[in-house]
Amino acid sequence: MTAERNLRKTRVGVVTSDKMDKTVVVAVETLVQHPLYKKRVRRTKKFKAHDEHNQCKVGDKVRIMETRPLSKEKRWRVVEIIESAPDYKSAPEV
């Protein structure tokens, strides 16, 4: 079973929405080359990912992995939180 999971696609992106229960929206940026002008252009694609424990918050950098369909649009799950977003609510005011 471990060898099978290594074949699954993984992506790294930033959480843009955590308003749903056990679901986050992750924006994944990729660089693609323009076919005519050869300039590298940034493309963003959003994935809905399963967050079992509701740990992710907006701004977190996360790794997601492909999984079986969990709902109509959800085919990814959060594997780990790479970098946590800064918490501005607890910062002291000037």
Curated annotation (Swiss-Prot):
Q: Which family does it belong to?
A: Belongs to the universal ribosomal protein uS17 family.
Any single biological process term in GO: translation
Give all cystine bridges in this chain: none
Protein's name in the database = Small ribosomal subunit protein uS17
The UniProt entry, under HAMAP family, shows: Ribosomal_uS17_B (MF_01345_B)
Which CDD domains is this protein grouped with?
A: Ribosomal_uS17 (cd00364)
Which Pfam families has this protein been placed in? Ribosomal_S17
Cellular-component GO terms for this entry: cytosolic small ribosomal subunit
Q: How does it assemble?
A: Part of the 30S ribosomal subunit.
Q: Which GO terms describe its molecular function?
A: rRNA binding; structural constituent of ribosome
Quote the gene name from the UniProt entry. Answer: rpsQ
Q: Which UniProt keywords apply?
A: Ribonucleoprotein, Ribosomal protein, RNA-binding, rRNA-binding
- Entry-linked NCBIfam families: PRK05610.1, uS17_bact
Q: What does this protein do?
A: One of the primary rRNA binding proteins, it binds specifically to the 5'-end of 16S ribosomal RNA.
